[in-house]
């Protein structure tokens, strides 16, 4: 099933039926954007023995709200805490992980999400979670006009300089692998074929989308390279 599972009644129906027939041994692998969570949903998940929850978030604050237009960052923070608190209180042992896709919109401060995840890990009450929640980072490749590789080199240099101030905080673990792919992009001196044309198209596309939504990108992403 596609879409946001917490909003799809068919997903809840499947969980309810599995619980009814005693199939709590089913492995659940669920990806959610954290825009919605209910007590009934949490209690349903707690009935299963093997649950993996993947939180799909692209950034923090206003940047995430721009990329995920239906999201509201304070609600996202509230919802992740509901998951974490419920896991502690119900003594479940879910596998939790955050997944970020880096595009031309969020690359300007992509490390802020990792920093936020680290701040959650550092909270005393969440240190009690048996399985530490992970962070995974991926570079977007399609559509081409949103691929961060089309950024002019001067922007890459500025982003890399800003990132290097945070870089020492990243542990040498599997998390470093995903972030390293972004670093490789930023350190590269090459751009894709037709990068200039794609970059101009991206700016025009962004302006057109903003007009439809009634948004202005620089109010959400101040470093965005357009007036």
Residue ranges of predicted features:
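Core AdoMet radical
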Residues: 1-9, 21-39, 46-78, 95-104, ...
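Distinct, well-ordered alpha-helical segments
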Residues: 10-16, 38-45, 109-111
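Alpha-helical packing segments of well-folded alpha/beta enzyme cores
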Residues: 14, 76-79, 83, 113
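Conserved, well-structured beta-alpha core segment at the onset of a catalytic domain
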Residues: 88-91, 105
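Catalytic cores of alpha/beta
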Residues: 104-121
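Radical SAM enzyme core and accessory elements
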Residues: 160-227
């Amino acid at each position: 099933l596609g879409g946001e599972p917490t909003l799809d009644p068919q997903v809840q129906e499947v969980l309810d039926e599995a619980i009814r027939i005693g199939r709590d041994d089913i492995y659940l692998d669920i990806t959610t954007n954290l825009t919605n969570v209910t007590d009934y949903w949490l209690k349903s998940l707690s009935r299963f023995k093997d649950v993996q929850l993947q939180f799909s978030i692209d950034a923090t604050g206003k940047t995430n709200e721009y990329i995920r237009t239906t999201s509201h960052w304070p609600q996202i923070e509230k919802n992740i805490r509901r998951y974490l608190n419920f896991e502690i209180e119900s003594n479940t042992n879910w596998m939790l992980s955050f997944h970020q896709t880096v595009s031309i919109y969020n690359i300007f401060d992509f490390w802020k999400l990792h920093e936020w995840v680290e701040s959650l890990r550092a909270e005393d009450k969440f240190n009690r979670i048996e399985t530490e929640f992970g962070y995974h980072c991926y570079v977007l490749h399609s559509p081409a006009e949103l691929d961060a590789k089309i950024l002019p080199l001067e922007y890459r240099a500025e982003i890399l300089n800003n990132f290097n101030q945070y870089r020492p905080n990243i542990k040498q673990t599997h998390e470093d692998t995903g972030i390293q792919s972004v670093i490789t992009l930023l350190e590269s001196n090459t751009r894709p074929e037709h990068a200039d044309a794609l970059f101009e198209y991206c700016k025009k596309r962004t302006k057109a989308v903003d007009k439809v939504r009634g948004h202005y990108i620089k109010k959400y992403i101040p470093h965005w390279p357009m007036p």
